[in-house]
């Protein structure tokens, strides 16, 4: 299968939308008044985000499944992804996050109207550090704690992601192996050679399937372990896109309790994961590649 870059952009859009539907859908189920899981276990959110990463990775890993601008930038900065496609990937990821969030709002709108806590409403869209109590005096502490939390969690995520996967997936494995063998002077038109390529690619894809499952559980573990201070972030598109949706939607949609989108904090879940990704991918490449 010859996968075009246009297909990859669309896949990043779809994959990021799925992440938001599963992840922020779980948050909405727990945070919004009147839902079946209102005020229930944080594990629901952990499972939601874990599956939100796992499902796109398993479904689209043979095409593309970065679904995170920070990861895309980290790979590009380390020479593992072409810079020519970074902007398109990030745009697709942010738009996918916004689309997924709009679907969540559509499904949960009656419960937004019932909810009286503005932080609970915002929490179903984007993150905010719990040090913040709507007092400007707490903003510095919230910013510092939030940045540290996002950086540590994102570093673990991206280091684990690079360790568990590599740039070649599915059909790309076949293309890479074919070009490599051509460069070595092999006759790739030979049926025996092509059979060997397909066997190797199939084995690599099977290994990556396990890696994708691992990534889902890694995200779930990080949400459970480090989600307490800020909520599940680790992804600039996951925070910025839904936060923008929150700021644009009127109270007639989200209810009279809709509060501030807290743009003063918005740079934290964008910049911290990006810096963590650059550091994690560079460190992994320096040690292992």
From Swiss-Prot:
Transmembrane annotation, as ranges: 10-30, 41-61, 87-107, 151-171, 209-229, 264-284
GO function terms (MF aspect): glycerol channel activity
Membrane topology according to the record: Multi-pass membrane protein
Chain location of the short sequence motif NPA 1 per the record: 68-70
Main localization, broad class: membrane
GO CC annotations on file: plasma membrane
Motif placement: NPA 2: 235-237
The organism's place on the tree of life at top rank: Bacteria
Localization: Cell membrane
InterPro entries, alphabetized: Aquaporin-like, Gla, MIP, MIP/Aquaporin, MIP_CS
KW Transport (keyword) present: yes
One Pfam entry name: MIP
PROSITE patterns: MIP
GO biological process: glycerol metabolic process
Coiled coil stretches, renumbered: none
CDD domains per the UniProt record, alphabetical: MIP
Keywords recorded for this protein, A-Z: Cell membrane, Glycerol metabolism, Membrane, Repeat, Transmembrane, Transmembrane helix, Transport
Domain topic, free-text comment: Aquaporins contain two tandem repeats each containing three membrane-spanning domains and a pore-forming loop with the signature motif Asn-Pro-Ala (NPA).
Functional description taken from the UniProt entry: Mixed channel protein that transports both water and glycerol.
Family in the record: Belongs to the MIP/aquaporin (TC 1.A.8) family.
Protein name: Glycerol facilitator-aquaporin gla
